[in-house]
Amino acid sequence: MIRGFHKDKLQYSFMLHHPALLRFIKDFNSGRYFEAHEHLEEALDEVEEIPAAWELSIGLIQIAVGYHKCASGYPGGEKMLGLGLAKVSSLPNVCNGVRLEELRQRLREDLADMQGVKGRLQKDPPRITLTK
């Protein structure tokens, strides 16, 4: 039990509208990938007992770190993007309110052409959207 709810019922909705997730998305969508990942890192203790929320959080953290590395020219961006994609690939298309299919498609495109990622991040940065 977590906060009076059975954790199976929270599996795919625990992070829905969670303040850390909302701050993550705001910073991620603004291209502040490093800042974005910090918001979810702060909330990890809250989700460690909820597998889908944990997988989503870790995957999004890895994706944000990967894009931060790519945008900044640091090594390791491709590896982090790949790890993040692998983590969110097992989740449903909508998990905890996050629409994942568009993000997964963007990650696949970026991983297929790592040479152009930095330019794409400037011209057409990835976006994370929520369900209503």
PLM segments and residue spans:
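N-terminal alpha-helical interaction modules that lie
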Residues: M1-E49, L83-K132
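TPR repeat positional signature
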Residues: A20, E55, L60-Q62
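Residue-level signature for tetratricopeptide repeat
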Residues: K26-D27, I61, H68
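Residues in the short coil linking paired helices within alpha-helical repeat scaffolds
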Residues: R32, G73-Y74
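Short, surface-exposed loop/turn segments at secondary-structure junctions
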Residues: E49-L56, Y74, G97
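Short secondary-structure subsegments characteristic of cysteine-rich extracellular domains
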Residues: I63, C70, G77-M80, G84
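TPR/TPR-like alpha-solenoid repeats
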Residues: H68-C70, M114
